[in-house]
From Swiss-Prot:
Keyword Transferase annotated: yes
Keyword Membrane tagged: no
Pfam family, one: PGK
Gene encoding the protein: pgk
Similarity comment text for this entry: Belongs to the phosphoglycerate kinase family.
HAMAP family: Phosphoglyc_kinase
Compartments (UniProt record): Cytoplasm
One GO cellular component, as annotated: cytosol
Designated name of the protein: Phosphoglycerate kinase
UniProt GO MF annotations: ADP binding; ATP binding; phosphoglycerate kinase activity
Species, as recorded: Pyrococcus abyssi (strain GE5 / Orsay)
Length: 410
């Protein structure tokens, strides 16, 4: 795959695809983490005389965080201490004229790419390259730099459509992400521990099955709704209230998949021995083998319990590699953040090479000031897709582009 240092960018127009899709509250962006993550790539291109055109999406149609990129341009301007022109167009004549007006070392940001219907659905590269987005923009750009690792599991025109039309190059963030994930995935050092929590149960089951089947993991620690599904699969009763909640979320149909994994790999999958519930507004811990488990009929599980935390902590502290995705419980409420905080603290304190991903995981370590994890991944879904052993369309596009253009490398 092409790296940034492979080309000369002076006076060249570079379409830089990033993922600045950020959490919003009351119509305002509340985290600039993704902006900061791509600054090294942007600065490198500007310092090397590129004319930079930034493309990102924000939210999904009809969602509350679906917005223009005007604020994104302003935030980026402040971080770069340089004007970033907001272009209220994507690939129309106005956008193309603005791109052509850029001088070396100048930067503009296109409108939210998902304002174009072509950018909303996943399609094969062959279809993506036939879109108006690719056809029109390819007339005014020289190179494509892809630094959107968080969207690497998607196959949309701005992400993969230029692969056979223009040289497509990894940005610094993309390169760093791939290196860290591959190091963790293919590591021969044991114990290799996967901590799977949160609400992306289907994806987490695929990860667990893949890494266990390939012999890439020695133990799986579960939390959040992932733990609930595996606990049910082990034959424990989680009570009416929790089963109703899981049914509503469509999680009961995943229990069979969890049972299949346990049939083959039971000793390697650890589930909580106790849980914390919201008992009349307070944290109450329930040991699964005690009579108090009757409370699970009327109260919802909100976190893993203290006994589980200790067991998980002991395993993590001995690990050589830890991959974590998703919180252990409802960390947004302080009384139920204990499991998430203590498990993530153990990862940070361990001597393991550690990778952590997922929006909620990152939010929790930022909220509680946890430092020391080796690599914080910007991509939750992309990271899970990678560890599930599935192809990332953006990586395939980068490889295709390299094969097509390797002879023209400057």
């Amino acid at each position: 795959m092409f790296r940034l240092g492979d080309f000369n960018y002076h006076n060249k127009v570079v379409f830089l695809r990033v993922d600045l899709n950020s959490p919003m509250k009351d119509g305002k962006i509340i985290s600039d983490a993704r902006f900061r993550a791509v600054l090294p790539t942007i600065k490198y291109l500007l310092e090397n005389g590129a004319r930079v055109v930034v493309g990102t999406h924000q939210g999904k149609p009809y969602s509350e965080d679906y917005a223009t990129t005007e604020e994104h341009a302003r935030i980026l301007s402040n971080l770069l201490n340089q004007h970033v022109e907001y272009v209220e167009d994507i690939f129309g004549r106005y956008a193309r004229e603005k791109i052509q007006e850029l001088k070396p070392g100048e930067i503009a940001m296109l409108e939210n790419l998902r304002f174009s219907a072509e950018e909303v659905k996943n399609k094969p590269i062959e279809e993506c390259e036939k879109t108006f987005f690719v056809k029109k923009l390819s007339k005014v750009i020289d190179y494509v730099v892809n630094d959107a690792f968080a969207a690497a599991h998607r196959s949309q025109p701005s992400l993969v459509g230029f692969a056979r039309i223009k040289p497509m190059i990894m940005g610094f963030l993309m390169e760093r992400e791939i290196e860290a994930l591959m190091k963790a995935y293919y590591s021969k050092e044991s114990p290799r521990v996967y901590v799977l929590g949160g609400a992306k149960v289907d994806d987490s089951l695929k990860v667990a099955e893949n890494v266990l089947r390939r012999g890439f993991a020695d133990v799986i620690l579960t939390g959040g709704l992932v733990a609930n599904v595996f606990t049910l699969a082990k034959g424990f009763d989680l009570g009416r209230k929790n089963i109703e909640f899981m049914k509503k979320k469509g999680l009961l149909e995943l229990v069979k998949h969890a049972e299949k994994i346990l049939d083959e790999f039971y000793p390697y999958v650890r589930t909580p021995v106790d849980f914390a519930i919201d008992y009349k507004g307070d944290r109450e811990e329930i040991y699964l083998l005690s009579e108090k488990r009757e409370l699970l009929n009327d109260y919802q599980i909100m976190d893993i319990g203290s006994r589980t935390i200790e067991k998980y902590r002991d395993i993590i502290m001995k690990a050589k590699v830890v991959v974590a995705n998703g919180p252990m419980g409802v960390f947004e409420r302080e009384e139920f953040a204990l499991g998430t905080v203590e498990v993530f603290k153990a990862i940070a304190e361990s001597e393991a090479f550690s990778v952590l991903g997922g929006g909620h995981s990152i939010a929790s370590i930022q909220k509680y000031g946890i430092e020391g994890i080796t690599h914080i991944s910007t991509g939750g879904g992309a990271m899970l897709t990678f560890f599930a052993g599935e192809e990332l369309p953006v990586l395939r596009a980068l490889q295709i582009s390299y094969e097509k253009f390797k002879e023209v490398k400057a």
